[in-house]
Structures are given as structure tokens and as C-alpha cells.
Amino acid sequence: MLTLYSDKKAHNCQGYSRRELLKIGALSLGGLGSPQLFAQEGQGYIRDKTVVMLNMQGGPSQYETFDPKMDAPSEIRSVFGEVKTNLPGVRFGGHFKRLAKMADKMAVVRSYRHGISDHAKAAMHVAAGGNPTGACMGSLFSRVAGITNSLNGMPANTLIVPAAVEPDDARKFNSVPTRIANTGKLSSVYGAFDPSSGGDVLDDMKLQVPHDRIMDQLSLTSSLDTLKRKLDSSSAIHQASALQQQAVDVLMNGVGEAFNLSKENPKLIERYDTSQFDVPKAAVDRRKNKDAIRGHSPISLGKQMLLARRLCEAGCGFITVSSPGWDMHGAHEFAITDGMPVLGPAVDKAVSAFIEDIESRGLTEKVLLVITGEFGRTPKINSKGGRDHWGNLCPLVFVGGGLKMGQVIGESDKKGAEPITNPITSNDLLGTIMHSLFDLGKVRTLANLPRDVQDVVGSGSPITELI
């Protein structure tokens, strides 16, 4: 991502002594100011946690994922059957064999509903936890914590779409970032950092400053101004001044290494790898919109989850991973029999690898993985071999984060259509995530944080069973 090049022998892995880096970081770089750029140290209101939100864009079926309903009629129950988990009496959809063996490390919610069945409205609602500003939870985190971690230079809020790890793939992956990374009423400077910004932006974000001029403020500022002009000319990135400051922070801390998957052990990359789960050619050929169907492919998901793990280790506070392709209406669109045989195993492999990886690194208590989508699917399979939009029940899973795992929360009715016990709301989702990220009592004492923001961040109620 961001590299500072030197023409002299390195004092450290970035090429400069700690004192030089501190001096550079202290330079007054005109025009780079932005509200709440840095997390404030010493107040203890930010917990040592990271949230990774895996968003199954398009709307995953509750039946084919975590609530198979095999006792229901054939037109309702999971098309691909069920698999026993390591929790007594709990079953997952037939494609989740690896995760079934880890159910004791998961908390599956079977009673989450919000009642919205429109893609854009539902996706933005879920990503925001239903908060009235419309800002996604990652942006809320960034608003309170600062857009850049002052201790390590990491972006506080990052979005990982397929193109972030598959930049050379010609297909257009069907990720819709604006639906899951919206800043709502907040300033756009609190938007997610997107490493897939496109074009030459990533290459342009390399400042060429010789070592003998590194302490020359005018030289450094000039280089940054050049970077800003390039960023301003790209429609992929807005609010360049704030991003530019973020880029300097990333630059000075060598954070770019966190985005480099080549640093990983090839055997670990293989454990995450989902490249084998491409959409079958036959499924593409019989569809009218072939490019759209190709874009449903989950071949990048393994790398996305691996990158998420690297960012967790590097200190990013909120990470959203987009997994497109879950809108399975059937006919000329994706059918369940087209989509689940590739999407299901891809999620099963990538997420199970992530859980094992996090555990092996001692990060289970620190990292909270949340798996959901904009809504669920209709109880009855339609005449086209698909399921339609259904906002009355939505898949929701939690893993880690120091919460209580190994349980199923809530219950749906016999048709898997409505909650019949313990209905969970988006406000509960918001409360659980904000409680994980912040000491909300201390957030209330922040003099520089507007009261309305404090109210929104603290408005949710954590899911009782998880705390």
C-alpha cells in the first residue's frame, strides 16, 4: 500500500530512525487538518477489540445457512439438507461442515428481524445497526475513535471488497460498497478506507522523498500535494485531505505491510483459499446477464478473510468484508442450486480458517466476527428455483470477542419465517457491537464528542445472552 523510499541505509524497517519518524509525524502539514483524525490516548474509552463484519450481500437464506428446518415441507426446508454440529440438537445447512464442528465457538441468532425487504434500504439499515444517522457502524466507530489509530497509523475503519485482493480479475464483482459502508449524516471523512480504490491510486500512494531531504518540510509537503492532486482526480476517493493525512500516518508507521498477503505462509494461504469455488460455466451460459452471474463468484473470499485477519493484528478497529452473490431469485438470475454449491463451501472454508487462525494467535477474545446480510429469504421456494427477499428473519452469527459462545439465541417458527422467541432487533446488534468496541460510560464523558453522537453510539442494548 504505502511505502516511503529511501536512498540511504535503513535505521529500521521503514528506513528511518524512530526520532526522524516522530519528527516527520510532528510536522505541520498545511491543509491536512480534519476533525477527530486521531484516537485520543489515555482515556481508556476504546476497548482493545476489533470487529470484523462479514456481509453476505444480496441476502443469504436462513434455511441454507444456519436454520435448515428439515422438518418443514420440501418447498420450505433447506435444499441441501443439514449437517449436525458439535452442539446437541443444533443443525446447520448442508454446506457448512467445517463450521458445524466449530459451533461451540459460535453464537447463532435465529430470531433477528427488521422487516425491510428492499436491498438498499435493508443493507444500509443492517450496516448501521438501525441508528438514525444512517451511518454504518464502522463510520460510527471512526467518528468516536478517530479515522486513524494514533498508536500505529492504521485506518480505524476498512472495507474489503473482492477487488481489494483480486485487482487483476476482469470480472465485475457484484459488491455494492455504498450499501454497507455509508456515512449517513456523518462527514464522508469517516467513510471506510478502501484498498481497492482502483486505477493507479495505490501506486500513487507511494511518496518518493530522498533521505537527505526527508526533514525538509517543504519537500515533504510538495510530495503530499502531488499525491493530493492525484487523489482528487480520481472519482474513487473523496475527501482527499483527510485521506492524505491518513496516508501519512500509514506511511510513517509502515502499515502498508499489513495489506500485503504475500507476507503470509503459503500453507496458511492455502487453508483460506476459495479459488476453487467459481461459478460453474453451465450456470453462466444459461443466464442472460452472464457478467452479473460471474460477479457472484466467491473466489476472493478466502483472501479477503485473510486480509481481515492481518488488519486485526495490525490494529484496525472495524473491518467490513463484502461477500456478494447471495441474491438467489432463480431463473435468469442466480438459483439456489447455482449459488449455494459455491457460496456455501467458500464461506465454510474461509470463515473456519479465520476462526482457527485467530485462535492460534491468541486473538479470540480480541476479535469479534459478525456474520449477516441485509435480510433472509422467503419460506417458500419460488417457481424459478429461488427464494425472494424476506426481512422478517435474517441470519446473524457472532464469533469470539469475549462474548458467550456455544449457543443458539432465539427460535424461529416451524416455517422459518418469523421469530417466536426472543426477537432480536438491529438496535440490539448496534448495542452489542458498540459495547464490544467502547466503554460507553467513558464515551459519555468525552467533551469533544457531540452529545447526539454519544446518544447514537450508546443507544443500543447488547444482546443479553452474549454478555
Regions found by a protein language model. Give the residues of each.
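Ligand-binding pockets and gating/stacking loops
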Residues: 1-467
